[in-house]
Amino acid sequence: MFRQRVFSCLARLRMWVAAGILLACAAIAPGKDIEFGGYTWQIRSGRGGPGPNSWAEDNVWLDASTNLHLKISHRDGHWSCAEITTRQRLGFGRYQFQISGRIDCFDDNVVLGLFNYPTSDVGSDGTHEIDIEFARWGNAHNPMGNFTVWPVEKSLQRETKSFRFGLPGDQTTHRFIWNRTQVLFQSLVGFREDDQEIFSQWVYRPKETDRYISDRPMPVHINLWLFQGRPPKNGLEVEVVLRDFKFTPESQLFRLR
């Protein structure tokens, strides 16, 4: 009887381990690739954070003009989100995103993220990352705009500048310029290559740069998702269009001056 119980427990353990492996694989299922802004991006699928949310390949596509569409969809009673990640890691330089969409009118539970993010060999969640996010984090009284720099060391605090804004139209440009000593954030009205029509700007320049600003190349992420996995309060699907992504290495920025 004892031997039967042992074998039974081992069989159940094998089943639980196998199920865990299957669930883990489902959460990090590799997605198909898409070409945008001169880079190859992997489209996310499966389920996981942030949120957590479900992520669907069908929520990402290019139109005939090679504009990138990201969508939060509601199908068969379930909500799903969109995320893409560059296959290549990028380092110091200017990261610029041109967006079509009324980001100032997002539902309180909608988040648009434009950011780099550490792979496991670079650091853990909550480190190294540089974020531009448009979100009210579920609270209608919060500002919509958020610039954030995460420290190199997990024990340190991130620094964030949040800001309110209203737009005259649906075209905006957002960028961060990252080097060893500072990060400059800018949000501008229209599709721009210059510094005109800035509606928000922040320079993050800490004293201990080696502890607060990463120097490690990282993939770029663009995602459109639901805060804590909550459906939009207005019950509507959300779509954002990116006209372009452009990365300019730091060495080329110096030559442009």
Where do the language-model regions lie?
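Bacterial N-terminal signal peptides that target proteins for export
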Residues: F2-V17
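Hydrophobic h-region of N-terminal signal peptides that target proteins for export
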Residues: R14-W16, G20-A29
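Low-complexity, Ser/Thr/Pro/Gly-rich disordered linker/stalk regions
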Residues: P30-L112, N116-T119, G126-G138, F147-V152, ...
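Extracellular/lumenal carbohydrate-interaction signature centered on repeated Trp-anchored short motifs
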Residues: T85-R94, S162-G169, I177
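Tryptophan-centric aromatic hotspots in well-structured domains and transmembrane helices
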Residues: F97, F115-Y117, F176-W178, F185, ...
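Short, aromatic/His-centered strand-loop micro-motif at the edge of beta-sheets
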Residues: W150-Q171
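Localized edge beta-strand/strand-to-loop motifs within extracellular or lumenal beta-rich domains
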Residues: P168-L184, L188
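Short, solvent-exposed beta-strand-to-loop segments that form ligand-recognition rims
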Residues: G190-P217
